[in-house]
Regions:
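N-terminal hydrophobic/helix-forming segments and targeting peptides
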Residues: 1-377
Length: 377
């Protein structure tokens, strides 16, 4: 393996194996079951005192405080959240020649998926293995090049599963079957990882790793609940559900953010964020200022660099749903800077990623359980 520019010890092998298991388990929005099962297995083996899930598959792992709250008082609850789902496609139509047409699950640039391989989870009785297909591309020799190049829309792209006709295709796939891109995770260097679903399997990984680190603390006065939410890519739906049911005192959310250090990105417009220079902390908008200040202080105490990101409005993450619940839940958002978001080659640095649960665990350890995150007016 090519050596990168890692300045901290290598990631714990069990943690890296768990991350790659999450990354390589198909979990499109609305069909997160397989990935959620892997997540629950890990948290149950790494400190959770209780786990549960709701009707839509949001998963929770609780770690009770080591110091009980005062008699009759409910424990101060910190929710550490990330969404489990990824973008993908859903079977929408099968034509007479057996070609499959799809609708998108989440935000997809059609130009980025031509020629890509897919795996569909079939609901046809008796079909137990993934159905493999590819998004067909007309050979360059056969293209009409007389006018301007045509940018094809998603509904114009077809998936070829090797079926000879409509009946053969429908014997293997039903309308509504979900598909994900067939791209496994890989290490580009000893620090740089590439995967189709860093967005946002890294968020659920952070939640589980924070729980694991907190379980090792000698004393902790707060209840920590790691949460793996569903359906973020199609509307933050899981976050709305868990905010209403859990009502934490504080929520720490992790998602991916844009690294702006690759060609073609205007930093004056999008900010300056470099992969490998530390996680990105959001400032403004849904982020509660006292929570942000404590996260920054915790990172400083632990000598962990954070890149500040201006977020005056929507963050485009689960934070936007959680902070509105229950009259306002104080939130913080720390993201992993990645390149090539919403493609099959999302790229990030492990050295950035593993610092996020370290900050969160330090944040939880420093709480007394009596905090009230609100401005002094």
């Amino acid at each position: 393996m090519v050596r990168g520019m890692r300045t901290i010890p290598p990631m714990r092998s069990e943690s890296l194996a768990f991350l790659r298991t999450l990354l390589d388990t198909p979990s499109p929005s609305g069909f997160e079951r397989d990935g959620q099962r892997k997540w629950l297995e890990y948290v149950r083996a790494n400190g959770a005192t209780r786990t549960w899930n709701d009707a839509y598959g949001n998963c929770f792992a609780e770690l009770a405080p080591t110091v009980a709250p005062a008699a009759g008082a409910a424990p101060f609850t910190v929710a550490v959240c990330g969404h489990a789902d990824e973008i993908g496609l859903m079977v929408n139509h099968v034509d007479s020649n057996g070609f499959v047409y799809c609708r998108q699950i989440g935000g997809i640039d059609p130009a980025s998926i031509v020629g890509k391989r897919l795996q569909f989870r079939s609901s046809v009785p008796g079909v137990t293995q993934p159905v493999i297909g590819l998004i067909g591309a007309t050979a360059i020799h056969l293209q009409d090049r007389s006018g301007e190049p045509k940018v094809r829309k998603l509904h114009e792209l077809f998936v070829d599963i090797g079926a000879k006709d409509e009946a053969a295709a429908r014997a293997r796939l039903n309308i509504g079957d979900p598909g994900t891109f067939l791209d496994a995770s890989m290490m580009l260097t000893d620090d740089i990882i590439v995967a189709r679903a860093l967005d946002n399997r890294i968020g659920t990984w952070v939640a589980a790793e924070t729980l694991r680190l907190c379980a090792q603390q000698a004393e902790r006065r707060v209840r920590v609940v790691a949460v793996s939410t569903v359906q973020e890519e199609v509307g933050l739906h899981g976050a709305e559900m868990i905010a209403e049911s859990l009502r934490p005192d504080v929520a720490l959310v992790t998602d991916v953010g844009h690294a702006t250090d690759s060609p073609g990105i205007t930093q004056a417009q999008h900010g300056q964020f470099k992969m490998g220079n530390g996680p990105k902390i959001a400032i403004g908008g849904a982020m509660q200022p006292e929570v942000v200040a404590r996260l920054l202080a915790t990172a400083d105490r632990l000598s962990i660099p954070l890149q500040r990101g201006a977020t005056p409005g929507s963050s485009g993450t689960d934070t936007d749903a959680i902070f509105l619940a229950g009259g306002g839940i104080p939130c913080g958002l720390v993201s992993l800077p990645i390149r090539y978001m919403h493609t099959t080659v999302e790229m990030g640095a492990l050295s950035d990623l593993e610092r996020i649960p370290q900050v969160y665990a330090g944040f939880c350890e420093g709480l007394t359980g009596g905090e009230r995150f609100a401005p002094t007016l």
